[in-house]
């Protein structure tokens, strides 16, 4: 089974994806880790690399191509990135969307990255706006369109174990025999 975990920065994607992969004994691949490594290799912060990606679309396209290739080639995998559900498309068996209010996400990022809350909030908002515009420009994706996801979870409502419990129940309850049709991922320009 290929499970995708998507959502905005600070929504808990990495926390859930790692826990879910461990619970299911699946492999875990993180687009965020790949992106942060790219930023570090270039001597940039993720926000700076996001800004550079506004001018150089190949940065996003290389990452997204890699995610789509991984989705096409692997099974028993939790694939995590902002666009994992979109990039995995028809290859995904279950697409999860995580979210939380901006202040909650900014607080998580401030704690994780040891920076002031207001700075984290501003950067998180700017990063989200930058990414949403690029996703629209490159692939005609509306990042706010959640219709492709099988389950959406507000991670501010539960602690990480609770989020895992909710999503693990959904995954373990899934049966291809009872599946009347997953939400299609249509009209995406997979032009890498």
Curated annotation (Swiss-Prot):
Subcellular compartments: Cytoplasm
Enzyme class, spelled out: transferase
EC identifiers of the protein: 2.7.4.25
One GO location term (cellular component): cytoplasm
Chain sites annotated for binding ATP: 7-15
CDD domains noted in UniProt: CMPK
SUPFAM superfamilies for this protein: P-loop containing nucleoside triphosphate hydrolases (SSF52540)
NCBIfam families cross-referenced by the UniProt entry: cyt_kin_arch
Similarity-based family: Belongs to the cytidylate kinase family. Type 2 subfamily.
Protein name: Cytidylate kinase
Organism field: Haloarcula marismortui (strain ATCC 43049 / DSM 3752 / JCM 8966 / VKM B-1809) (Halobacterium marismortui)
Encoding gene per record: cmk
